[in-house]
UniProtKB/Swiss-Prot annotation:
UniProt-recorded name of the protein: Serine/threonine-protein kinase Nek8
UniProt KW keywords: ATP-binding, Cell projection, Cilium, Cytoplasm, Cytoskeleton, Disease variant, Kinase, Magnesium, Metal-binding, Nucleotide-binding, Phosphoprotein, Repeat, Serine/threonine-protein kinase, Transferase
Ranges for the RCC1 repeats: 416-467, 468-519, 520-585, 586-637, 638-690
Domain of life: Eukaryota
Organism: Mus musculus (Mouse)
Cofactor(s) demanded: Mg(2+)
Length: 698
């Protein structure tokens, strides 16, 4: 097992435990079947050996790939391909009563057909073909058949006599005790096709005798007449009572119904969707970016390009801009010819996630690498430069979200696994110690949960699971972990949340935390200095008396300041001494300290009451991010505004402090939409994507 790292138990097979593991050599997720051979009967050991023998013979994209087998602690370990999309049975169950399109049914069916043809070509019977043994890739587009534990290799005999398989898929000849050959697998194939078309099994009954009676009589409900007569006839032929009347696989593949789907499999699966620049058929003036006609749900630009658009040069897939920390205007970061869909800023880190699931980092070049010295007579400091790189050693992992704290980073994979790296001070990495780690390492305490989001504060972390379970770790003073104490923890702790408050999103600040719940309400904990969490119980424009001011909350508490406690909130973010929120109607509210104008009001008032940002009336806001003493907000049409403290480029322009929102100019010549924004201390990262008429793949 030195080559593998166990992640979690994902199931129990016919004869043993099934583990999801990480192969250390290439960081690829694999399945390890652990079969305790010493506790097995002779027949069971033969079945386990048979599975290895069968898997070694097969090599097909629609069959689960075999890697190796070895002995470990008196158990046979079989390493094989991991299919992250679950089983076809689970896919069908999630459809409820929503029937699949015929094209989708055939897309799945012909892949099963190809896999079974490959198996039969090697003189192997599957003998347990069912939707539970048909697996899907992560995009749920490619199917793979697996579980050959009871397969039979036909060496010299043409028929097998043992009765095995799942009862609902057993053929009539097996019910009669007759010998069978490949036609029994074709019966099971018909059962799978029927299940795809009707979302239920062809043969079901309360007990085994009743089930056998149904199978022997061939009694099953017809599939919906929304499907073509050819598909309905194919189901009937596959489920013929007489094995000789069931068509062989080669005949099924030759049917006109299947030919187009088979051609699509060979031409479309695995193809790379390309973007192309549309060339105008007739010369004409450039089209303004607001008149492209494309629609986007994210923040989208409506301005006119600064120059003529040259259709021969396609726009970049995306751009990431950075400002602050000495950058007085947005600097476009190098992109490595990829599309970044989400960004996160830390005290020193700049990170992003690409559409393909890779983690990209932007770093300052080492001293002496060029561009870092002034020429004689120069009066201005050179603009800082950055180099981009992909995080190495994660080739088998798909990242879907990243968050940054002070000198540490957390990332979330598409399988719901959280990995952390960087500084281990305050226990922020969640590994049960304070050790620094340079490479992303799995937070083992959360492997039993499927996580959907992670957020980092300066020195603490919140993580949310698919079932709404909340975990926190790191520094705990001020009650920022929401655990009811001020204690710190170097390992994830489950956070109690009041019943009915289903968490949808988590947010971390310097010394506080928030969770956004399903009805658009917000709970907060930690330091409430200046009422930056909105925990004071205030009516509109009311100021609390000193003894009513809430200075900190050790547990997650509903906001009490109007209108935050009344209007549904879509987005919230926490700065050092202030916070911001966007309501369902697109209004932006700020609360907390206004020392540097970060609340966006005309007067530098000293108030604990939330205020609506001035100057954004009539603009629907969709995103907001808070830095140490400034705020950045994004409108539905892609407008970017900033306000607050302006030193060291915090506002993305050469202004000093600005108490009211002003636009930030991005160097974009094509229509764009803002996909992500992140502020930390005095830095901002913002990602935009070019808007084209062609849809972007999910």
């Amino acid at each position: 097992m030195e080559k593998y790292e166990r992640i979690r138990v994902v199931g129990r097979g016919a004869f043993g435990i099934v583990h999801l593991c990480l192969r250390k050599a290439d960081q690829k997720l694999v399945i390890l079947k652990q079969i305790p051979v010493e506790q097995m009967t002779k027949e069971e050991r033969q079945a386990a050996q048979n599975e290895c023998q069968v898997l070694k013979l097969l090599n097909h994209p629609n069959v689960i790939e075999y890697y190796e087998n070895f002995l470990e602690d008196k158990a046979l370990m079989i390493a094989m391909e991991y299919a992250p999309g679950g089983t076809l049975a689970e896919f069908i169950q999630k459809r409820c009563n929503s029937l699949l399109e015929e094209e989708t049914i055939l897309h799945f069916f012909v892949q099963i057909l190809l896999a079974l043809h490959h198996v039969h070509t090697h003189l192997i019977l599957h003998r347990d073909l069912k939707t539970q043994n048909i697996l899907l890739d992560k995009h749920r587009m490619v199917v793979k058949i697996g579980d050959f534990g009871i397969s039979k290799i036909l060496s010299s005999k043409s028929k097998a006599y043992t009765v095995v398989g799942t009862p609902c898929y057993i053929s009539p000849e097996l019910c009669e005790g007759k010998p069978y050959n490949q036609k029994s697998d074709i019966w099971a194939l018909g059962c799978v096709l029927y299940e795809l078309a009707s979302l239920k099994r062809a043969f079901e009954a309360a007990n085994l005798p009743a089930l056998v009676l149904k199978i022997m009589s061939g009694t099953f409900a017809p599939i919906s007449d929304r499907y073509s007569p050819e598909l309905r006839q194919l189901v009937l032929s596959l489920l013929s009572l007489e094995p000789a009347q069931r068509p062989p696989l080669s005949h099924i593949m030759a049917q006109p119904l299947c030919i187009r789907a088979l051609l699509n499999i060979h031409t479309d699966v695995g193809s790379v969707r390309m973007r192309r620049a549309e060339k105008s058929l007739t010369p004409g003036p450039p089209i303004a970016s607001g008149s492209t006609g494309s629609r986007a749900t994210s923040a989208r630009c409506r301005g006119v390009p600064r120059g003529p658009v040259r259709p021969a040069i396609p726009p970049p897939l995306s751009s990431v801009y950075a400002w602050g920390g000495g950058l007085s205007s947005p600097l476009r970061l190098p992109m490595l010819n990829t599309e970044v869909v989400q960004v996160a800023a830390g005290r020193t880190q700049k990170a992003g996630v690409t559409r393909s699931g890779r983690l990209i980092l932007w770093e300052a070049p080492p001293l002496g690498a060029g561009g870092g010295t002034l020429l004689p007579g120069a009066v201005e400091l050179p603009q800082p430069q950055f180099v981009s790189r992909f995080l190495e050693g994660q080739s088998g992992v798909t990242i879907k979200h990243v968050a940054c704290g002070d000198l540490f980073t957390a990332c979330l994979t598409d399988r719901g696994i959280i990995m952390t790296f960087g500084s281990g001070s305050n226990g922020c990495l969640g590994h049960g110690n304070l050790t620094d780690i340079s490479q992303p390492t799995i937070v083992e305490a959360l492997l039993g949960y499927e996580m959907v989001q992670v957020a980092c504060g300066a020195s603490h972390v919140l993580a949310l699971s698919t079932d709404g379970e909340l975990f926190a770790w790191g520094r705990g003073d001020g009650g920022r972990l929401g655990l009811g104490t001020r204690e710190s923890h170097n390992c994830p702790q489950q956070v109690p949340v009041a019943p009915g408050q289903e968490a949808q999103r988590v947010v971390c600040g310097i010394d506080s935390s928030m969770i956004l719940t399903s009805p658009g309400r917000v709970l907060a904990c930690g330091s409430n200095r200046f009422n930056k969490l909105g925990l004071d119980h205030l009516s509109l424009d009311e100021e609390p008396v000193p003894y009513q001011q809430v200075e900190e909350a050790l547990s997650f508490t509903p906001l009490g300041s109007a209108p935050l406690d009344q209007e549904p909130l879509l987005c919230v973010d926490l700065g050092t001494a202030h916070s911001a929120a966007i309501t369902a109607s697109g209004d932006c509210y700020t609360f907390g300290s206004n020392q540097h104008g970060q609340l966006g009001t005309s007067s530098r008032r000293v108030s604990r009451a939330p205020c609506r940002v001035q100057g954004l009336e009539g603009i629907k806001m969709v995103m907001v991010a808070c830095g140490d003493a400034f705020t950045v907000a994004v409108g539905a049409e892609g407008e970017v505004y900033s306000w607050g403290k302006g030193t060291r480029g915090r506002l993305g322009r050469r202004d000093e402090d600005a108490g009211l929102p002003r636009p930030v100019q991005l160097d974009e010549t094509h229509p764009y939409m803002v996909t992500s924004v992140s502020c930390c201390h005095g830095n901002t990262l913002l990602a935009v994507r070019s808007v084209t008429d062609e849809p972007v793949p999910p």
